[in-house]
């Protein structure tokens, strides 16, 4: 991914990982992760989706606090390899058939937090087509970008997972009218 991602299959997050992939020098390598998702698949139609964030790729970084250090567009690629009972294989990749929409996370920075617009929620967005996740005009074709396959490398470093959840201490309205949960 160019940026951070969470990937979902049939409405469930495929791992407990957060801030994936870890930091890398994007001009030298692109990290990928491997997940076992067999238990999340079911007969018939299955739905995969991803939520993207700026991360280290295009978010604020470094002593200069500059943005877009490696690029200015987030991107995500996925390859799902299906192995059937008879041993045959099928590979499903992301590509121009994928669709995108504006997510409720409208701002996401590693060091500056997150802004969430609940009005943009689609409760079942990563599940097979339901009236709730396919409102007319909401989804659009994604823009595909080439990536240098030679730079792909398996993530070897440890992964980031939630260790503790801390409840909000207060909710208030900021001077600009937005609601802040702190």
Outline where the language-model segments fall.
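Accessory beta-strand-rich segments of carbohydrate-active enzymes
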Residues: 1-118, 182
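Activation corresponds to long, low-complexity, non-globular regions
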Residues: 88-181
């Amino acid at each position: 991914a160019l940026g951070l991602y969470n990937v979902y299959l049939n409405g469930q997050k495929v791992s407990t990982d957060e801030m994936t992939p870890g930091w890398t020098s994007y001009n030298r390598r692109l990290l990928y992760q491997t997940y076992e998702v067999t238990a999340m698949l079911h007969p018939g139609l299955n739905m995969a989706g991803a939520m993207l964030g700026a991360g280290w790729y295009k978010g604020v970084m470094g002593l200069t606090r500059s943005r877009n250090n490696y690029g200015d567009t987030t991107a995500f690629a996925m390859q799902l390899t299906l192995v059937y009972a008879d041993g045959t294989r099928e590979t499903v990749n992301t590509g121009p058939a994928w669709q995108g929409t504006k997510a409720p996370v409208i701002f996401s920075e590693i060091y500056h937090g997150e802004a969430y617009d609940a009005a943009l929620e689609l409760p079942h967005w990563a599940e097979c087509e339901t009236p709730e996740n396919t409102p007319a005009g909401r989804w659009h074709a994604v823009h595909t970008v080439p990536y240098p396959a030679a730079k792909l490398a398996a993530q070897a470093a440890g992964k980031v997972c939630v260790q503790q959840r801390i409840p909000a201490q207060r909710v208030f309205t900021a001077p600009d009218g937005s609601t802040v949960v702190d």
